[in-house]
């Protein structure tokens, strides 16, 4: 029964194939060959050729495992500068009037070709060539130089004013010295008093430093330590 069922299934498939693509009746002289050629020309055959790969790559996918593409952040475009674009356009209109000798040849990056640039070298630099040449010279003061006669007059006037101020200061010091002498003070006594004041200030600075360190160690303020040593806040 099983063989009979297989035979019926095979006959059914064969009849279906004949119905889809009927075969013309056989004729003498090999008349069926054109039909075979027509079928071969219509049908497309795909040949799959397997090339044995290395042993360590068998059973793996032929394409390498790549990481998934990360989503790209949208590019942030800066503010537009229409003023710069207009300036470049106006400069491009003026450039054709310039001579071709001023337009140098600039090498393109990553290539051995020399391409003639659209702008002169002065356009590439921030300062004009005239300014760079002037900078190479000696330093010039921004103040205008006075004339010879005017300079002599002003210098003499300024010298007279300085001399007058020094004389007034000397007279003032002489008056103070004469006043101290009249009160009974002497120059040696005044110098001794000044040296004692300097020594007092030095000792006071050292004492304040020691009081501050002691206050930090005890965790109190220096104001609380003054009565302990018999000192006043005015000292």
Curated annotation (Swiss-Prot):
Component of the SWI5-SFR1 complex, a complex required for double-strand break repair via homologous recombination. One of its GO terms (biological process) is cellular response to ionizing radiation. Belongs to the SWI5/SAE3 family. Residues 139-159 are annotated as: Disordered. GO terms for cellular component: nucleus; Swi5-Sfr1 complex. This is DNA repair protein SWI5 homolog. PANTHER family: DNA REPAIR PROTEIN SWI5 HOMOLOG (PTHR28529:SF2). Keywords: Coiled coil, DNA damage, DNA repair, Nucleus.
């Amino acid at each position: 029964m099983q063989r009979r069922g297989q035979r019926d299934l095979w006959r059914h498939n064969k009849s279906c194939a004949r119905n889809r693509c009927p075969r013309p009746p056989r004729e003498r002289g090999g008349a069926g060959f054109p039909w075979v050629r027509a079928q071969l020309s219509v049908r497309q055959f795909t040949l799959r050729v397997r090339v044995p790969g290395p042993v360590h790559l068998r059973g793996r996918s032929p394409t390498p495992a790549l990481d998934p593409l990360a989503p790209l952040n949208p590019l942030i475009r800066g503010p537009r500068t229409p003023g710069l674009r207009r300036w470049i356009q106006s400069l491009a209109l003026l450039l054709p009037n310039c001579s071709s000798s001023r337009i140098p040849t600039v090498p393109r990056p990553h290539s051995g070709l020399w391409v003639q640039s659209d702008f002169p070298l002065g356009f590439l630099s921030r300062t004009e060539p005239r300014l760079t040449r002037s900078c190479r010279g000696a330093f010039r003061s921004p103040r205008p130089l006075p004339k010879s006669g005017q300079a002599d007059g002003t210098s003499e006037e300024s010298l007279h004013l300085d001399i007058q101020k020094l004389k007034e200061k000397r007279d003032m010091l002489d008056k103070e010295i004469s006043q101290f002498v009249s009160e009974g003070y002497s120059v040696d006594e005044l110098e001794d008093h000044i040296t004692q004041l300097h020594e007092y200030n030095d000792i006071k600075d050292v004492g304040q430093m020691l009081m501050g360190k002691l206050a930090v160690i005890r965790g109190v303020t220096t104001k609380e330590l003054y009565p302990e040593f018999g000192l006043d806040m005015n000292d």
